[in-house]
């Protein structure tokens, strides 16, 4: 269990999890409000 926590707290694993969470939030936000993310220039 200690080794698993040490592995999960390494930077590449944390970065991957953070990117997946961020992408999920953006996808869900874009599903409900499709026009708010892309403003016309």
From Swiss-Prot:
Membrane among keywords: yes
Membrane topology of the entry: Single-pass membrane protein
Entry's localization field: Cellular thylakoid membrane
GO cellular component terms, semicolon-separated: photosystem I; plasma membrane-derived thylakoid membrane
Top-rank taxon: Bacteria
Residue ranges of the TM segments: 7-27
InterPro entries listed in its UniProt record: PSI_PsaJ, PSI_PsaJ_sf
Gene Ontology BP term (one): photosynthesis
Keywords linked to the UniProt accession: Membrane, Photosynthesis, Photosystem I, Thylakoid, Transmembrane, Transmembrane helix
Pfam families: PSI_PsaJ
HAMAP family in the cross-refs: PSI_PsaJ
Family according to the record: Belongs to the PsaJ family.
Function field: May help in the organization of the PsaE and PsaF subunits.
UniProt-recorded name of the protein: Photosystem I reaction center subunit IX
Organism listed in the record: Trichodesmium erythraeum (strain IMS101)
The gene coding this protein: psaJ
